Amino acid sequence: MARQIGSRSLARRSGRSQYLIGMRPSRRPLRGLLRMNDFLNAIKGLHHPEERPEGASRRTHDSIAALTAAALSTALIALPAIADEEPKYGGALTYMIPADAPPSFDGHRESTYATVHSVAPFYSVLIRVDPENPADITRFVCDLCTEMPQLTDGGTTYTFKIRQDVKFHDGSPLTAADVAASYEKIVFPANGQLSARSSNYLMVDKVEAPDPTTVVFHLKFATSAFLPALADPFNFIYEKAILDKDPRWYEKNILGSGPFKFVDYQTGQSIKGEKNSDYYHKGRPYLDGFTGIYADKQAVRVEAIRSDRAAIEFRSMPPSARDELVKALGDKITVQEGDWNVASAVTPNHKRKPFDDPRVRRALTLAIDRWNGAPAISKIAIVKTVAGIVFPGSPLAATKEELEQVAGFWPDIDKSRAAARRLLKEAGAEGLSFELLNRNVDQPFKYVATWL
């Protein structure tokens, strides 16, 4: 019997207002891929046995194999090395989802782990970060396509050939038309529709499916940001026939072509899936099924792991909760720690005064003491490294010295706040006060909001 806390993960084995704060997976193309793909790899069991890290659980039958050091954040792994073992089939994974419920099931609309951790196992995507090497966020592999495309027209045309052996869970064949329709919804949302990542696709001119096995993306200009944007793990492929009838159907319903079929959803309690015996990646998944349990209170999640009511949480815990589990479980648990690739984000509504004035927005970012705040909050909340828009330590990440030249990252907080006060005065917003909306989840939202 063993447990694992993860980085955003925790695992155990056994037999509208003016201002908003929230943590979300990054919307920049080179962020927001690693950690969410770690969850997808784990639940789908996508690693080859010879490349599995230490710590995979017997109960989860190597489906937790993606929780490597490269998976980043706090990880408590509690097993001897089993890299030489063959994968084992069967069993069910029970994992915690640190939320009361997803706002909707539509991955195109949402940007919260509450949605992707709930429904990603039911869906396919066009391409993804390589599950055999998730630390390399510049390498992408096919899920629904047959091979990665060769660029044409000076890098402005991407042509994908689509597999012909894929079926939706209702028995309908998945074709290029479904892929194109899904990306049309993501890239060019119709009036009244929300697309959380449409701004990542400003380079896209049009998407077309000239035949049932071909999808073509035509770009306005060549850019290396396009493939990372395509590989976003929220880009579920939906059935065109359903979207044509009701483009909002997927907000309240689930029907995909992924490794698991939807079984049951109890609002605020759980979501369940069962193995898709017709899954096109032969031999996967290893699990017979899974259950995700919702709990927005950390104490509930800690107790679930400790008492073996759940095997894993795919996010993190602050040091106090981590240490509590280590103390309770002793040598059955091992800690690995690293960085996150999510942002604790404060988002002003730039369409409302005074936040429509860039001087006010600049003043707000100047007032936040990131360098002193992050280390302090990290002692009681799941807050990690101060960073820019690219994952810290990755090839394109800004250095600390480079960040310190950016407004909001200056090392002298007194200088920053003096500049902030001047800007507010210039904008006629001295004595500014506002309502701060915050997610009703304890970690890390309430702690970060209180500090702010």
Question: What do the PLM-derived regions correspond to, one by one?
Answer:
Residues 1-76:
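Intrinsic disorder/low-complexity segments
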Residues 16-19, 37, 56, 88, ...:
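Surface-exposed binding/hinge segments that line
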Residues 94, 175-182, 212-218, 258-259, ...:
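Alpha-helical secondary-structure segments
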Residues 96-153, 184, 253-256:
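N-terminal lobe/hinge region of extracytoplasmic solute-binding protein
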Residues 113, 147-192, 210, 216, ...:
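Aromatic- and charge-enriched surface segment that lines or borders ligand/interaction sites
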Residues 127-135, 231-285, 289, 299, ...:
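Gly/Pro-rich hinge or "lid" segments in bacterial periplasmic/extracellular proteins
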Residues 186-189, 206-208, 263-272, 291-352, ...:
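Extracellular/periplasmic solute-recognition and catalytic clefts
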Residues 260, 381-426, 441-445:
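Structural transition elements
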